[in-house]
């Protein structure tokens, strides 16, 4: 019973770490999606602030507002129009959000199982103490 409780605690910890990574990724994707949403108003020659991660922005001059470079997976980037990039990022963000929900559900399930198992262990201990006639806590 104790080994199973330890396993649940370990799994909860792993899921919590995974949730942190997914939440960070979702935030990055949301920021990129928001940026691309406002990019349609930009004209050639405009100075803009470009988010580069970690809360850092750099100043840049737009040379072609019809093209952006976006990740298409596996560390490969491709040139595309801002709308297509926003759509890809939105789809990735939605998949990450689904994964976040699944991980949260996994955490909740393990926490519920852990709580139930802990209550069973406490009840068994109390029953054992009562059978021995020892004082209970």
Name each model feature, range by range.
Residues 1-72, 76-137:
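Intrinsically disordered, low-complexity regulatory regions in eukaryotic proteins
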């Amino acid at each position: 019973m104790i080994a199973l409780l330890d396993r649940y605690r370990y799994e909860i910890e792993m899921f919590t770490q995974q949730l942190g990574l997914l939440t960070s990724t979702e935030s990055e994707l949301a920021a990129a999606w928001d940026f691309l949403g406002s990019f349609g108003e930009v004209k050639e020659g405009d100075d803009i602030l470009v988010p580069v991660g970690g809360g850092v922005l750099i100043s840049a001059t737009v040379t072609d507002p019809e093209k952006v470079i976006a990740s298409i997976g596996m560390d490969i980037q491709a040139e595309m129009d801002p709308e297509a990039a926003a759509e890809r990022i939105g789809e990735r963000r939605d998949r990450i959000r689904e994964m976040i929900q699944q991980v949260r559900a996994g955490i909740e399930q393990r926490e519920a199982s852990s709580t139930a198992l802990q209550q069973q262990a406490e009840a068994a201990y109390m029953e054992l103490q009562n059978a021995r006639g020892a004082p209970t806590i």
